[in-house]
């Protein structure tokens, strides 16, 4: 599993990875985990996505860029986000729907690491 360094709200994290899960109706959910600067303990950093009622493609998610202001540009730099096809309204906020490169996402995913050792 590849890891990355991430900075959010003036806090630096290292050895970060995505936990890829699913919301109730099968839509992808992403959470970021990693270590705060010099700490070796892994902790939850942020939920990156928001569950919505709108129909999304299998490789689309809604990014919570209100809580994670630099996340989309960061995901673009990693090659995980391919495009931003539209926006949706969630609790009075206009949030972007992004198209993901799932192969690239899974390179940084805890789930992929578990599957590798399970086979």
What are these regions (language model features)?
Residues 1, 115-119:
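Short intrinsically disordered terminal tails
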Residues 1-23:
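Short, charged/polar N-terminal "headpieces" of proteins
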Residues 4-6, 11, 54, 61, ...:
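Hydrophobic transmembrane signal anchors and adjacent membrane-proximal interface regions, especially
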Residues 7, 19-21, 31-33, 51-53, ...:
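A structural detector for beta-sheet-dominated domains
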Residues 13-15, 25-30, 78:
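Short, surface-exposed beta-edge/turn micro-motifs
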Residues 22-41, 85-89:
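Short, flexible beta-strand-to-coil junctions
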Residues 31-80:
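Acidic, aromatic-enriched beta-alpha/helix-loop junctions
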Residues 64-116:
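Short, compact, well-ordered microdomains
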């Amino acid at each position: 599993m590849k890891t990355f360094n991430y900075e959010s709200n003036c806090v630096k994290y290292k050895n970060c990875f995505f936990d890829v899960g699913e919301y109730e109706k099968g839509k992808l959910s992403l959470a970021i985990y990693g270590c705060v600067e010099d700490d070796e303990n892994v902790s939850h950093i942020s939920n990156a996505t928001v569950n919505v009622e709108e129909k999304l493609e299998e490789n689309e998610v809604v990014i919570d860029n209100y809580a994670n202001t630099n996340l989309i540009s960061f995901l673009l730099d990693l090659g995980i986000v391919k495009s931003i096809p539209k926006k949706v309204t969630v609790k009075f906020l206009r949030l972007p729907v992004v198209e993901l490169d799932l192969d690239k996402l899974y390179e940084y995913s805890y789930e992929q690491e578990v599957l590798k050792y399970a086979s």
